[in-house]
């Protein structure tokens, strides 16, 4: 992971991420408990139901581990990209609660902040983000953190120039992430740089088709930018496209 990056992950859990020793101990305990459960489960099934159930128990343990490690993060990301923020937040919360490493937990918590902001709860997102020490994050996590801080600032009427400075740092780290470029364009509109914003928004599709939810917001931002430039016809075209994509 980290989770999906956009204008967008409990504050108490995030605060603990500052203390690697405590986090490491928690993750070691979780991993040991999981290994123990996967080992004891088949043995107990065999003792109660007979030897054939040992193999069934092993298969179930492998399947459950795959569900936790692979399926759950992928479906959380997919729910976010489909704008199903409540579902995505529940899955990220479960990932964080069962994470075996500090990085996996941080990524899930950052993604939960994204869900909160995208769902219209920027104050909740801000509380989570404030619990992180930015200097302790790796590059991918820092991109998510910077992006989400910029989005919260824009969504709460903060200084658009400060939001732009945050997102420019994220772009310098990961210029290839369309959702980060979308945040950059939103900040450019907020500071009145409409031509620059249009250029960024148009370039977002250079790498291929976007997820429908992201394409819809891209079109809405293009409509806003063209409105500001006094081009209502262009703006109307992009609003129509946004409605079509969002269906």
Please place each PLM-identified region on the residue numbering.
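Transmembrane alpha-helices and immediately adjacent membrane-cytoplasm interface residues
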Residues: 56-82
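Start-of-helix register in tetratricopeptide repeats
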Residues: 70, 103-107, 140-144, 179, ...
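Structural motif corresponding to the intra-repeat A-B loop/turn of tetratricopeptide repeats
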Residues: 82, 119, 156-157, 191, ...
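TPR-repeat structural position
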Residues: 85-86, 122, 159-160, 194, ...
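Short coil turns that delineate tetratricopeptide repeat
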Residues: 100-103, 137-140, 175, 209, ...
């Amino acid at each position: 992971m980290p989770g999906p990056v956009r204008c967008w992950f409990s504050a108490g859990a995030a605060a603990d991420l500052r203390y690697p020793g405590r986090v490491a101990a928690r993750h070691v305990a979780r991993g040991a408990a999981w290994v123990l459960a996967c080992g004891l489960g088949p043995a107990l099934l065999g003792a109660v139901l007979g030897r054939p159930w040992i193999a069934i128990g092993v298969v179930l343990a492998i399947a459950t581990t795959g569900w936790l490690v692979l399926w759950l993060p992928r479906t959380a990301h997919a729910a976010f990209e489909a704008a199903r923020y409540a579902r995505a937040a529940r899955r990220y919360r479960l990932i964080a609660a069962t994470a075996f490493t500090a990085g996996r937990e941080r990524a899930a918590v950052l993604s939960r902040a994204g869900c909160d902001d995208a769902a219209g709860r920027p104050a909740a997102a801000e509380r989570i983000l404030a619990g992180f020490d930015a200097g302790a994050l790796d590059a991918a996590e820092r991109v998510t953190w910077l992006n989400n801080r910029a989005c919260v600032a824009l969504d709460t009427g903060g200084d658009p120039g400060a939001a732009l400075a945050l997102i420019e740092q994220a772009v310098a780290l990961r210029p290839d992430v369309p959702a980060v470029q979308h945040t950059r364009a939103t900040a450019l509109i907020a500071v009145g740089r409409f031509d620059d914003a249009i250029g960024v928004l148009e370039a977002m599709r250079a790498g291929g088709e976007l997820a429908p939810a992201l394409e819809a917001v891209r079109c809405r931002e293009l409509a806003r930018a063209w409105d500001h430039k006094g081009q209502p016809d262009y703006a109307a075209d992009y609003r129509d496209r946004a409605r079509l994509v969002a269906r």
